[in-house]
Amino acid sequence: MAVDASRPFPLIRNKTLNIAALLSKKNTKSEKQELDFATVQVPGVLPRLVQIPSEEENAKCFILLEQIIEKNIDKLFLNYEVLCAYPYRIMRNADLTIDEDEAEDLLKEIQKQLKMRQWGEVIRLEVESGIDKRLLRFLKDELKVAEEDIFCIQGPIDLTFLMKMYGLPGCDHLRYKPYTPQKNPKIEPGENIFELIRKGDIFLHHPYQTFDPVVDFIRQAASDPDVLAIKQTLYRVSGNSPIIASLAQAAENGKQVSVLVELKARFDEENNIVWAKKLEQAGCHVIYGLVGLKTHSKITLVVRKEEDEIRRYVHLGTGNYNDSTAKLYTDMGMFTSKTRYGEDATAVFNMLSGYSEPLVWNKLSLAPLWLRGKFLSLIEREKEHAKNGRPARIIAKMNSLCDPGIIEALYDALSLIHISEPTRLRC
């Protein structure tokens, strides 16, 4: 695509790979060389990794699609000399600007905002190291990118193509040996999950232990004639989710099914809209989330009629109800039928689906109202133990730590207590 007075700089889609080129018309008599700019999108429908013959026996040789285009780019611009060509990629601001207080229909508003995401502000420009300065200046001006948001990449841009190589035949040496998750010693496949939970709480550690009991918990609840209701929060689920299928089946079987599908789950908004509609069509009561907040908790409540009582079964987890990522991500979960957990789980869903704000909790703490205070009191408790000569230690595992109050409290406790804190992202 050429760029000049009549052909404006095109919309470059987020994270697509493109090639920028500087051109000069051949056989011009002008003393001053006039430069033209063009951009070529690397086709996303073609394999980026192209295998070519190798001179060495049993060796595999590959070339990238953008390298093929670069070597032959002159064929796209007849009667023009290609002075230089370099690949580049942009990233756009993916935040959705939603005025939830004014939005009459959150689902429709998010759908509208998703269409506008492709026009988001460019927040990162990646270029190949050694790019021609004239070409870089042109890209910077047209894309309106700040100097600090330009990244010169040594080697190929966007390394996700390496996953394709990982899966190719003959590349076994690039792969770890497959890991088979262990069964939880308290759970035998095919057994009644509710009977097992009644015997005692069950702790799960994924991916070292299989996620199957969680999937089976929802599946059995959907078909169990004694189950009256299922309530669940969903943030991210797999592409062909057995949990979604079980929830839909439960509603079709006449059970009361309430599901909070978080429509504002970053980069899963479109998927979650699809799942929300599917669950609604099956007869589930679907909640789209709370105004001004993201519901990130992972909790399931199953209400079951047993002899002369109603018993509540609860699953709590640190990870998504996603049977695919549960094979990779380190998370913990717990099944329980203890009354106090059941009462708290009921209170959570009453908050999510209605107008309710409990003042007292038995076991659970929720952000943003109570969780920070709970952690601060636990840190203070360990400090008091240390001051009084009792054993004191803090072990905290988290994705990220960015709350100023918690950070300050941990620093304050560090002089008294040994703190182990594996943090996945940032601190």
Could you describe each region identified by the protein language model?
Residues 6, 176-182, 187-188, 344-398, ...:
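Flexible, glycine-rich loop/tail regions that form catalytic "lids" or insertion modules at the edges
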Residues 261-329:
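Phosphate/diphosphate-binding loops
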Residues 116-123, 224-231, 252-260, 282-283, ...:
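Short, surface-exposed connector motifs at secondary-structure boundaries
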Residues 59-80, 88-90, 301-376, 380:
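Signature of lipid phosphatidyltransferase scaffolds
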Residues 415-427:
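Residue-level detector of conserved catalytic or cofactor/ligand-binding positions
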Residues 243-253, 275-279, 409-416:
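Catalytic-core regions built around general acid/base machinery
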